[in-house]
Amino acid sequence: MLRLVVASPGAFSPRGLHDRRVVITDSADSPLAYGSRIGDGYSIIVPEVASFHFRPGSQDVAVQAEPLVAPERVLDAYYGAALPMAVQVVLERQPLHASAVVVPGIGAVAFAGVTHSGKTTLAYGLSRRGFPMWADDILAIDAFGVEGVSTIRLPYRLNLRAPSAAYFEGRPETGVARGEQDPGEWATAPLVAFCVLERRDRRPRAGSSVVRLPPTEGLMALLAQAFWFEPQTSAERRQMMRDYLEVVARVPGFRVSVGPSLDALPALLDEVEAKVAACLRPAA
């Protein structure tokens, strides 16, 4: 597990831009966060908000906030930028840009995709059908866990956008209460399926919105949504590739086409449920 701690004043000196590499960008490809490393120390810098510092072998992620920055902005920077990088460096697990739910008694289903693709909306919609939320926006994957490919439940704050929140407000939940205790942060669950979301400007004309991905396409789709620290060594790059190759070799993947209208969400959730359930059902 990881824990966020406040760095003592002056513990870390600022680094010049020439020593930094972009690690996270926004939808317009503008830099949001930078990475830097000195010896065995790693830093994530979110300009005008905070810098975060961590190293292998320590559970602490030390934060040094800029003056007068609201705590909420610092926490947003931690969850969105520092946490995924610390997962890779400290925990040696792969952070994926994904939300996830749990199929009780079976395992986690991930929904990966770019910002605004509908990850949180789909996961939250399924949570209202009786599949508890497991992750929002960042999912930690352990490709070589004791029980195969597994996930780690990271700390998160639900980031349901205003149109989706308005859509769900007042609509009844349809899931049956399952009476399971919340496993809490840092719990683990097998990864039993992953879905890569593809945003469409218009509703698909015909055919399925949920299509099984062959492993090669699944690998490329997951790598497109993977977080990784920069600068990255060749050994770290090889390990990341080994991990994702293991994921696509053992876990079924799907491409999910998401249209622009929330009115189509119930039908899409029905199809996701049916396709994933059919894949998880034991062969006769």
Predicted segments, located by residue:
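Long, basic/Gly/Ser/Thr-rich N-terminal segments
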Residues: M1-A70, L75, D270-A284
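A short, compositionally biased
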Residues: I38-G39, P95-H97
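N-terminal pre-Walker A segment at the start of P-loop NTPase domains
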Residues: L75-P95
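Glycine-rich, often acidic-flanked micro-motifs
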Residues: S99, V103-V114, R128-A284
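Conserved lysine of the Walker
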Residues: K119
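Post-Walker A alpha-helix
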Residues: L122-A123
